[in-house]
Swiss-Prot record:
Name of this chain's protein: Ycf3-interacting protein 1, chloroplastic
Gene Ontology biological process terms in this record: photosystem I assembly; response to photooxidative stress
Described purpose of this protein according to its UniProt entry: Nuclear genome-encoded factor that participates in photosystem I (PSI) biogenesis. Cooperates with the plastid genome-encoded protein PSI assembly Ycf3 in the assembly of stable PSI units in the thylakoid membrane.
Subcellular locations according to the entry: Plastid, Chloroplast thylakoid membrane
Transmembrane annotation, as ranges: 238-258
PANTHER family, sorted: YCF3-INTERACTING PROTEIN 1, CHLOROPLASTIC
InterPro entries assigned to the protein according to its UniProt record, in alphabetical order: CEST/Y3IP1
Subunit structure: Interacts with Ycf3.
Membrane topology: Single-pass membrane protein
Length: 263
């Protein structure tokens, strides 16, 4: 078995190639096969060349400093993109903020009410787009519009330009945006108070309506100055008379029967 083995010595590795793997032994054993007659010095040299070439290829190293620098540059570019929004986006944001301010001043609408209104979609518009065949599946949804409105309320510029544009168009088309809401009139007498003569206690009215004492006093004065709906000539006498008819008829029947029994 020892006669069938050939030992080859490899040249020592250079100390400059520090990245090459360390070889524990410089001797490799080549087994002989049954085709011994074809073995030659040229074959040994070829095998030795291939072996040395395979061992000379060290592991592939990645420069971590270059990768970290490239990643940092990419993050800086993204931050610059976020810090420099599109001028058209800034214009849409200013329009939406203006509409929100008008709704709060003229309609007394809070931000939650405006957001809820934006999230509700008109079924007529959905049916119209479906019939006309202009319904786009990739168009921004109502949730996207509400998210964009939430970002604008927080002082941010939405990144979704399509949702921002659609939101600005809807906010600008809000009906009667410049018209102020009509103010409520002073509280007057209720229908129950007008139908009864119990009157209104100013203190109780001030507590229930949460108004000042002067306003409650005005309600009491108006209650006293109003004319009654029922004329004083009739009053409740007609009601008592109608209610007494059954009693009068019953007493008359009893008297007639008693008179007939005496005869």
């Amino acid at each position: 078995m020892a006669s069938n083995m050939l030992q080859l010595s490899l040249p020592p590795l250079s100390s400059s190639s520090s990245s090459l793997p360390f070889l524990s032994s410089s001797v490799y054993v080549l087994p002989f096969t049954h085709q011994r007659r074809h073995f030659s010095f040229f074959n040994v040299q070829n095998y030795r060349f291939r072996l040395s070439r395979s061992t000379s290829l060290g592991p592939l190293f990645v420069n971590k400093e270059e990768d970290s620098a490239t990643y940092a540059v990419t993050e800086e570019e993204e931050d610059n993109d976020d810090d420099d929004p599109d001028p058209q986006s800034l214009e849409y944001v200013s329009q939406i903020k203006r509409v929100l301010e008008l709704l709060k001043r003229n309609r007394d609408m809070l931000f939650g009410e405006v957001k809820l209104t934006i999230m509700i979609e008109d079924p007529r518009d959905v049916e119209r787009r479906r019939l006309l065949g202009i319904d786009d599946e990739n168009a921004p949804t109502r949730d996207d519009l509400a998210a964009a409105l939430e970002e604008i309320n927080e002082g941010k510029v939405p990144k979704d330009f399509a949702a921002l544009q659609m939101l600005a168009e809807e906010m600008n088309s809000w009906p009667n945006l410049e018209v102020e809401a009509t103010k409520q009139n002073k509280p007057g007498r209720s229908l129950y108070a007008k139908a009864t003569d119990t009157g209104i206690d100013p203190k109780e009215a001030a507590k229930r309506l949460k108004i000042d004492w002067d306003s409650a006093a005005e309600i009491d004065e108006s209650a006293e100055s109003d004319e009654p709906d029922v004329p004083p000539a009739l009053g409740y006498g007609a009601l008592y008379l109608v209610s007494a008819f059954p009693i009068i008829i019953g007493i008359s029947v009893v008297l007639i029967l008693f008179y007939n029994s005496l005869q």
